[in-house]
């Protein structure tokens, strides 16, 4: 079943088409550090972009972070994600792993990634390898460092804005360390905007990706990651990126004078103002250990892309993920809320309910959908990848599946109730109306997820990475109160509703 684009997606696609039509066969201008106007343009149009050259970052991190990248790569911990774009399942050219606070998730391109936890106090984490544990510890250490640097950068930005000064590109060599500190309230706000709770690690070897797309607006060359805003972040929160390309230092050079535009052998990050065809874009070369920071609302007002070089590259992208609906604690609380309506359980799995109030039933069925499609199916669609690093998610997923199964019994109890003799026509109609939409959505989404697990691209994946259509059961499974395919159930509800209203 083809997913219908959201209004936001349709608007974004329309903007892109209009922009390409305006360009016709011309390229928009962009600047590199060799251009005279580069730093002036950065000063005027990109003042919330902060860059740190590798030489300004502690040598200890430059030793430990690359080792951690290579360790995770050696153990096969990074995976290309199977994402849905415009109704089509495609593998991302970039391999990824999410590391962060235990129980956190991060969603991008309608795909929920689950953290491999970094080692925090009070949480027991069983890693499959001591090397993987050490790597996760390293990224927590990097996270702490980048957090401190981000707060410092935000403080300096606030001082400049308050003084109404012209902002300048904040390269580490000239980065000011003095100044009047912020107020207590401001300090709390700055800390919250740098409270990185996850890092999304990326890896790509361009030699193995010969079909990379060309950058469409400026002619910047091959893109590893297309123009985008980072999704699912706390409003106005910062993003910090540590870049590590695998070439030796002797191969790196800041001399790009022989190239028109950017050096295609060197990785770059590109920036542009969203949907602006007047302001030149920027491309900044990325060498081993360089970092950059997107502060305040830069991620909302500007777009960025990653332009491929010739050598493999890792990056660690630290974010303040918007987790109000994306933590294990959250979804467990939601399950508890839905199951508060259960009066008692019988030995055969049937349940009786406290209330058949339409609002209570509707809420319960919506939570049922949430745990099934935002958690269980998202997790198992990614195969067994998480077990390569840790068993941390095994017990929570078993727990969620048990709670979800009880919700299946709740739905069955509702469907039994509408067939009960003595129920008034009005009550029957209200109950049916309350559950029809969530059950119709459940049926449609089950079809979609089942079809995605059978997609052609899935056949190319190794066994451990193949999507698992879970939960799934056959029609005559005695342990399940309702069928997997709800076509007949939904059809009967519609018929009953028409009958009740006639």
Curated annotation (Swiss-Prot):
Chain positions covered by the region annotation Loop L1: 210-221
Cofactor needs: Fe(2+)
Induction: Up-regulated in the hypothalamus after 48 hours fasting.
Keywords: Acetylation, Cytoplasm, Dioxygenase, Iron, Metal-binding, Nucleus, Oxidoreductase
Residues that bind 2-oxoglutarate: 202, 292, 313-315, 317, 319
Keyword Nuclease: no
Family of this protein: Belongs to the fto family.
Subunit field text: Monomer. May also exist as homodimer.
Written domain comment of the UniProt record: The 3D-structure of the Fe2OG dioxygenase domain is similar to that of the Fe2OG dioxygenase domain found in the bacterial DNA repair dioxygenase alkB and its mammalian orthologs, but sequence similarity is very low. As a consequence, the domain is not detected by protein signature databases.
UniProt protein name: Alpha-ketoglutarate-dependent dioxygenase FTO
Organism: Rattus norvegicus (Rat)
Gene name of the record: Fto
